């Protein structure tokens, strides 16, 4: 089962936390839809800033949006001008007052989502898929990952029949619940169609009585 299920969803409450942290009763549907709109809007607008993930915490009529980015300077802008502009745009999408918090991803080379997006960018630039996969795998190990698995699925190399190819180095123990595994997925839009890229990175084990591993 560990091979099939999302590794982050499987570890919620063990060594992973929810990306949306709020409670709603009758307004659950509208708030969930708001979260999806906020995430979709930010991902599209701030793609070049290297967005790893977005956490949303809600209180009464307030929503705190934590944006984890590899290049926070692009989001903040000169003297924080871009932040204010972004806040107003998000308040048009949401019915709550928005508080934006930008957090830097210090090691984007071992962040699964950013690695997947890096491979996607290379594929869109017509880099050979095996070369792109291998380069990212070796870079992740160099920056301290204990293990990494990358898989690409689609019309690889312009082949007529779609297939899946994967590359793994080190350990990626999907059945071990105490293992700190990061997961990322994106799609590359190539001339031959879409190619799905999935990345799993193993950062080490979170042992009982020990604090959660420091995030990249």
UniProtKB/Swiss-Prot annotation:
NCBIfam families: rpsC_bact
Record family assignment: Belongs to the universal ribosomal protein uS3 family.
Record's function text: Binds the lower part of the 30S subunit head. Binds mRNA in the 70S ribosome, positioning it for translation.
Molecular functions (GO terms): mRNA binding; rRNA binding; structural constituent of ribosome
The gene coding this protein: rpsC
GO biological process, any: translation
A Pfam cross-reference name: KH_2
Protein name per its UniProtKB record: Small ribosomal subunit protein uS3
Subunit organization: Part of the 30S ribosomal subunit. Forms a tight complex with proteins S10 and S14.
KH type-2 domain location: 38-106
């Amino acid at each position: 089962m560990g091979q099939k299920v999302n590794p982050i969803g499987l570890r919620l409450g063990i060594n992973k936390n929810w990306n949306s942290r709020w409670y709603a009763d009758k307004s659950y549907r509208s708030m969930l839809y708001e979260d999806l709109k906020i995430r979709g809007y930010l991902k599209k607008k701030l793609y070049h800033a290297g967005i790893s993930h977005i956490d949303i915490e809600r209180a009464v009529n307030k929503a705190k949006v934590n944006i984890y980015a590899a290049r926070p300077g692009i989001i903040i802008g000169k003297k924080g001008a871009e932040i204010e502009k972004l806040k107003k745009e998000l308040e048009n999408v949401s019915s709550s007052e928005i508080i934006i918090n930008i957090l830097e991803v210090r090691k984007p080379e071992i962040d699964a989502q950013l690695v997947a997006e890096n491979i996607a960018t290379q594929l869109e630039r017509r880099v050979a898929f095996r070369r792109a996969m291998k380069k990212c795998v070796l870079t992740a190990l160099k920056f301290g990952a204990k293990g990494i698995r990358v898989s690409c699925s689609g019309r690889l190399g312009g082949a007529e029949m779609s297939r899946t190819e994967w590359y793994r180095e080190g350990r990626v123990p999907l059945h071990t619940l105490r293992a700190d595994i990061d997961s990322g997925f994106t799609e590359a839009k190539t001339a031959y169609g879409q190619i799905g890229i999935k990345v799993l990175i193993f950062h080490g084990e979170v042992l009982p009585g020990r604090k959660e591993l420091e995030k990249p």
